[in-house]
């Protein structure tokens, strides 16, 4: 009988991938902008042609979410991709600041972990951004979606090979093991790590040399004020929460309602497909849905509200889209106060907006994953207080947190990897092309207030040289 040591194979493969990625980088920097853009068009066309097949394949592997929603979101992204990226520089572009200039540079070897939800979208976006910035990329897929992600990577590798890109520019760890992954994420060769995983699957990454973007779904909250358009709020929140069966970055987890608006909210929620669970029902559901550590059972992630209710033995209406658990207080021990990977929300009732404000903070601090908060209100002062005082990465106004946070119907970037924290050198918590680049400030001695140190002739000469360098960068790359 042949015995295979997967750990050793995984470590060996990880080392080879790192070596090849580092070697490819030296060749990549000679590739001009026109050649890069032609390649990006081909990769975009590949995804556009194959998105239906890939999304269905991913669903067959994972049973998570709704492949129709991933296709819809993917096509929306592709239709808006060129306009979306126009405002972001490419490498060697000169970025003009108020008092100085910066040049965009490739960040280096990058590593991305892919979660088993929206896996084709997150893979495409990471690969596209990495190629755009000429960053060699190593992909590590969750085992549940490994076949789909591997197919995508191998298909795009063929396109790279046909266009004479170096070996190692893009690859995937096919011998998965904890030790192999550790070899990758602890390597000094890695400059950027995108950790896009479900919270309970997060790695304990330690790497002082790499910037780490920790993406997650988040424990996101919606506050519904008594003076807002309750019909609009109810419709948008329910449709956002049910999108992809609740597997969307920034998706709604808890609703905080002002007492005077409660009855109207319940009426409208029911109208749009909400089913309110009794205390006995939500206790029964909790026992079925969560394990003893309060983690959602993997086989029940991304199921529809009706499927979950049926498994739990709870009779719901035929038009049920979302399950609502009414809670009197926030509990560290209750899974309903945290991230939920299904169309389930918790509902909290407060006397007024001030108490609602405190409840939102309590929910945010409960598991420290308060990524997005939405406020539905027409009161400018109340909106201002929520924006100013909530410890979250982003606040949305009169927009659902789920679809709004990923850039649908808002001015936020269209992005499928969201974080609670910024990384050095980038002021956005939605993954953008800038996360795959570093920016180096360029200064030149051309100010007249130092003429006592330098002659005017020298200053002009230096300035001419500086302009020549900038023009050369823009022309050649």
Model feature map: region roles:
Residues 1-103, 129, 271, 475-476:
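N-terminal Rossmann-like NAD(P)+-binding subdomain of aldehyde/semialdehyde dehydrogenases
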Residues 89-232:
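Rossmann-like NAD(P) dinucleotide-binding subdomain of oxidoreductase/dehydrogenase enzymes
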Residues 2-3, 16, 23-25, 29, ...:
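Conserved C-terminal structural/oligomerization subdomain of aldehyde/semialdehyde dehydrogenase
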Residues 101-106, 162-166, 184-188, 204-207, ...:
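Solvent-exposed alpha-helices and their adjacent loops that cap or buttress functional pockets
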Residues 22-25, 29-32, 44-51, 55-58, ...:
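Structural signal for hydrophobic packing residues in well-ordered secondary-structure cores
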Residues 185-188, 229-230, 290-298, 336-338, ...:
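Short, surface-exposed amphipathic charged segments that create phosphate/polyanion-binding patches used
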Residues 7-9, 203-331:
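ALDH superfamily catalytic-core signature
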């Amino acid at each position: 009988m042949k015995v295979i040591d997967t750990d050793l194979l995984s470590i060996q493969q990880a080392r080879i991938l790192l070596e090849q990625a580092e070697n490819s980088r030296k060749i990549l920097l000679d590739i001009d902008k026109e050649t890069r853009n032609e390649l990006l068009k081909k990769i975009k066309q590949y995804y556009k042609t194959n998105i239906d097949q890939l999304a269905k394949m991913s669903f067959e592997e994972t049973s998570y979410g709704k492949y129709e929603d991933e296709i819809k979101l993917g096509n929306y992204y592709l239709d808006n991709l060129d306009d979306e990226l126009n405002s972001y520089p490419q490498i060697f572009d000169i970025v003009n600041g108020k008092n100085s200039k910066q040049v965009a540079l490739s960040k280096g070897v990058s590593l991305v972990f892919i979660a088993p939800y929206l896996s084709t979208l997150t893979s495409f976006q990471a690969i596209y951004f990495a190629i755009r910035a000429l960053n060699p990329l190593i992909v590590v897929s969750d085992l549940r979606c490994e076949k789909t992600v591997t197919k995508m990577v191998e298909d795009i590798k063929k396109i790279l090979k046909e266009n004479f890109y170096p070996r190692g520019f893009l690859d995937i760890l096919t011998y998965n093991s904890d030790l192999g992954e550790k070899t990758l994420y602890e390597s000094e060769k890695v400059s950027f790590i995108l950790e896009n995983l479900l919270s309970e699957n997060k790695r304990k990454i330690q790497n002082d040399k790499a910037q780490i973007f920790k993406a997650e779904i988040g424990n996101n909250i919606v506050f519904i004020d008594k003076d807002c358009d309750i019909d609009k709020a109810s419709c948008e929140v329910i449709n956002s929460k049910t999108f992809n069966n609740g597997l969307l970055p920034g998706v709604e987890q808890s609703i905080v309602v002002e007492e005077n608006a409660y009855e109207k909210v319940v009426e409208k929620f029911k109208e749009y497909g909400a089913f309110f669970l009794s205390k006995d029902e939500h206790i029964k559901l909790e026992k079925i849905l969560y394990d003893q550590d309060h983690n959602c059972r993997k086989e029940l992630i991304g199921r529809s509200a009706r499927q979950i209710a049926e498994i739990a033995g709870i009779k719901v209406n035929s038009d049920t889209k979302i399950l609502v658990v009414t809670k009197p207080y926030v509990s560290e021990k209750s899974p309903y106060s945290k991230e939920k990977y299904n169309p389930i929300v918790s509902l909290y009732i407060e006397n007024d907006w001030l108490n609602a404000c405190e409840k939102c903070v309590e929910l945010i601090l409960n598991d420290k994953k308060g990524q997005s908060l939405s406020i539905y209100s027409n009161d400018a002062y109340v909106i201002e207080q929520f924006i100013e005082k909530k410890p979250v990465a982003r606040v949305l106004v009169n927009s659902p947190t789920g679809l709004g946070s990923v850039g649908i119907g808002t001015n936020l970037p269209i992005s499928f990897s969201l974080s609670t924290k910024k990384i050095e050198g980038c002021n956005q918590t939605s993954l953008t092309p800038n996360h795959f680049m570093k920016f180096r400030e360029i200064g030149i001695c051309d100010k007249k207030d130092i003429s006592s140190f330098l002659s005017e002739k020298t200053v002009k000469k230096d300035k001419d040289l500086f302009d020549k360098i900038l023009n050369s960068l823009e022309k050649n790359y």
